[in-house]
Amino acid sequence: MLKQFLNQYDTIIFDMDGVMTSEQAYWDAAALTVWEYLKWNKDEPINAPECMENLQEIRKKIFCDDQLIAVLKEKGVNSNWDLAYITVCMAWICGVEDDFSAVLEYARNMSENILNYYDELALLCSKKTGFDYDWLQRNHLMWQTMQGIFQEWYLGDRLFEEQYGYVPRICGKSGLLFREKPIIRLEILQQLLCELSETKRLCTATGRPSVELFQPITDWDIKKYFALDGFCNYDHVVAAEQGKRTLTKPHPYMFLKALYGTDYPDERILNGDYDRSKIKTTLVVGDAGSDILAAKAMGADFCAVLTGVAGQAGRKYFEEMQAEYILNSLEDFLIIKT
């Protein structure tokens, strides 16, 4: 049975990572990307299946029992491509190969907003290594190469070739995407979405590209509960931005696109040409600051779930931001009889 506060909403829009989907597979891919890239730059070949077997040991070493992930996320690193990239830059600056404790300490002493520090980091890295500054900059050749390696690990050989049209540089990667598990119990997630879909339009607004969204929700047999035109994802953002503007969260574009339908013209959304009355009966569910900021910019009610990277520590932030609801997880949407 659904909790009563949900009765007032006709549409529910879900962020995915930290809400339904876990970021664990992405962090695994980031660790393997760092490992492979550092080896590659020393001309040391890797064995992909062997790396998969030793994945937990590699991740523990690279991210210092995930402490490095937490520090970098707190300092504004939202993209997992950036997580891998900045870890390699810091490893080169610190001159480390196996012991990443120095990298963790370096990260702790960095600016509170690392997003403003990328160029300086690339410059320091250039001075330390002798590598070309332009090559080292974010979104330039080094970053692009690492992004490709990340996608190889995450998608696996078959999906990567289908998406990008060429064979991975190193084959034998089975794809971490296929190992994904929901952040709450699958049977509870299925029950929740089934009950919600009986009276509400369900949508997604996620930074994942379509293939990374559809694979897990298809595997978990929950895709059928969402509106066919309600799957807003990163592909829609790229198409709408056209290289001219930034429409990722905290911009409200993704939530608006999900609400009014992926066929609704982007220009009408961006020009404010839509029925605002629908927003009053829309609930946005997310786990991050960018989610609540986008919901507020849109004018929708917001429900925070504390299953993201910050966990229970995020409660104070969402209280200060005046979220309408703060729940431990999506399971709290249901009245579960024991």
Where are these regions (language model features)?
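Short, charged/polar "capping" segments at the starts of alpha-helices
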Residues: 211-214, 310-315, 335
